[in-house]
Amino acid sequence: MSEEMNDQMLVRRQKLQELYDLGIDPFGSKFDRSGLSSDLKEEWDQYSKEELVEKEADSHVAIAGRLMTKRGKGKAGFAHVQDLAGQIQIYVRKDQVGDDEFDLWKNADLGDIVGVEGVMFKTNTGELSVKAKKFTLLTKSLRPLPDKFHGLQDIEQRYRQRYLDLITNEDSTRTFINRSKIIQEMRNYLNNKGFLEVETPMMHQIAGGAAARPFVTHHNALDATLYMRIAIELHLKRLIVGGLEKVYEIGRVFRNEGVSTRHNPEFTMIELYEAYADYHDIMDLTESMVRHIANEVLGSAKVQYNGETIDLESAWTRLHIVDAVKEATGVDFYEVKSDEERKALAKEHGIEIKDTMKYGHILNEFFEQKVEETLIQPTFIYGHPTEISPLAKKNPEDPRFTDRFELFIVGREHANRFTELNDPIDQKGRFEAQLVEKAQGNDEAHEMDEDYIEALEYGMPPTGGLGIGIDRLVMLLTDSPSIRDVLLFPYMRQK
């Protein structure tokens, strides 16, 4: 911390003591506002300077917020007060507020939180402003804000001290307001479709529902090992068995994996399940829901991301994974039969694989390494191999593949789901195959879940499901390059 900064902090503490000496509480209590800055502008900005003079008796307002600018000498001055909705100018005159309150104004620092009561007027330049009749200090700020002209330039500091980022960066505030709206519109859409929002456990006895490493914790009283959930899936499908035919949950999921611009150890997902639907129905629902959210939150289903226009309005492409790989590489996995041929093709195309990988794993590696990043416009990739889809129903026409899809936009997976496997015998066999993979070193392979098998044995109707990473969807709809830009408090390494 610089000497200048230390000096500023010292001066602010001296002012704090002066307030106490005057009997003024520098950390005040309630203040009744008549509205936000945007409300005042909407109501009063339509009038001319002269009209506001005529309406002065009816324009009494009360606002509160943080002082962001301050200027003026002598017996009057201007400032901008910032609240959730933006900023509005205030004008403080000694002959209007009195000596004591004007002294408060003179000694106020940028960053202080103030309350102002007054009337609306326009300056000679036409800026709508509040002429103060009463000035109140609500909270004394003991640290100076980042430089007002340059803001918070250090990206890491923005993530570590999000509160400063929100104070100084209007774009960040807008991103998180839109994040809230996106989730709300998701709820509105599903509730209007008859879905029921539910809550299921975050600590599991078995880590299941996804291919991922879990965080492990311990329940002291029960002396039991528990896992932070890596997916919401298996509990929701138990509810389908129980007769709750359309359910969804929006919640946190935890995966013990690396941190990147796309990944955070804890993130937010929505998972939903609909009885008597299949993966075609869920693709339709996904497309419709995302389009609805974009239109409601942004006013358009054509969004800008990283300089490109992403068209969510037009019909989305649907492409089988084998066809996608063939288009990109010329390799037709419908015709590839032996393990030796698959491994030779992988080597020829520079695909890194492990010796234990089978047909489905190698096909998936081709897709992830050669196709995924090229899918800029919304594209459903469907028909994933059985080996990598232990919870998905096999395709009846070709059991090498499943009735599963993933949604890719701007080269990233945004959704994943399938027609759910509801055959308990087949499901148990898939889990057993996953245990073999785990024994061979795949630490993301699925555990056996006997309780879930038992639930399926009571009968689960044909069901379609969906999982969407909300953080990535928010990244797309807010043109944010990193997942840390859409998480209020992303994981950061300890200093």
UniProtKB/Swiss-Prot annotation:
Q: Tell where it localizes.
A: Cytoplasm
Record-linked InterPro entries: Aa-tRNA-synt_II, aa-tRNA-synth_II, aa-tRNA-synth_II/BPL/LPL, Lys-tRNA-ligase_II, Lys-tRNA-ligase_II_bac/euk, Lys-tRNA-ligase_II_N, Lys-tRNA-synth_II_C, NA-bd_OB-fold
**What's one GO-annotated cellular component?**
cytosol
Q: Which UniProt keywords apply?
A: Aminoacyl-tRNA synthetase, ATP-binding, Cytoplasm, Ligase, Magnesium, Metal-binding, Nucleotide-binding, Protein biosynthesis
Catalyzed reaction equations? tRNA(Lys) + L-lysine + ATP = L-lysyl-tRNA(Lys) + AMP + diphosphate
Note how many cofactor molecules are bound and how: Binds 3 Mg(2+) ions per subunit.
- Please give the chief subcellular localization of this protein: cytoplasm
Per UniProt, Mg(2+) 1 binds at 406, 413
Which Pfam families would you find in this protein's record?
A: tRNA-synt_2, tRNA_anti-codon
Q: Do you know which CDD domains this protein is assigned to?
A: LysRS_core, LysRS_N
Question: What superkingdom does the record give?
Answer: Bacteria
Query: Assembly state and interactors?
Result: Homodimer.
Describe the family membership recorded for this protein in Swiss-Prot or TrEMBL: Belongs to the class-II aminoacyl-tRNA synthetase family.
Name this polypeptide is given = Lysine--tRNA ligase
Q: Which organism is it from?
A: Staphylococcus aureus
Q: Which gene encodes it?
A: lysS
